[in-house]
Amino acid sequence: MIDLRSDTVTIPTTEMREAMAQAPVGDDVYGEDPTVNALEERVAEILGKDAAIYMSSGTMTNQVAVRTHTEPGDEILIDKNAHIYFYEAGGTAALSGVMCSLISGERGVFGAKEMEAAISEKEPHTTILRPVDLHLPRTKLIC
């Protein structure tokens, strides 16, 4: 079985260590790491995109995605058990200045019915159905 939860729960095999030692290296910040460049090019090709970017963790990826789509003072709607809410040390608030509004879904999946229920519970404290009010967060992202 391959465990992809984290590199902290697996032990590299001898072959993996040898591959790491033999891999060509460079500075990925300056686009000089051939291994990272090849990975990004391959992923972009697989996904049919112009480019891809390698990020070192799922947490980093989540936070970059939130920050890309929001501004400080915004709100995101997420499932009440979302990883981004429970296991990222408040990164959404700390790094992006964004608050999370929780929705009751089923294993991270929620639909229009659950969103409507969440909105009804917050009325009139939501900007989803009302004009922007500087006292309320702007809903910008549904995760």
Map each language-model feature to its residues.
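N-terminal amphipathic/basic leader segments beginning at the initiator methionine
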Residues: M1-A19
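Structural motif
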Residues: I2, A51-Y54, D74-I76, M99-S101, ...
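Generic secondary-structure signature for well-ordered alpha-helical cores
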Residues: V9, A21-G26, E45-G48, G97, ...
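Conserved N-terminal alpha-helix of the aminotransferase class I/II PLP-enzyme fold
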Residues: T13-G58, D79-N81, Y85-F86, G91-A93
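Membrane helical hairpin/interfacial module
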Residues: N62, P72-G73, L77-K80, S96-M99
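Glycine-rich loop at the start of a catalytic domain that most often binds anionic cofactors/ligands
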Residues: V64-G73, G91
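PLP-dependent aminotransferase-class I/II
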Residues: S96-I142
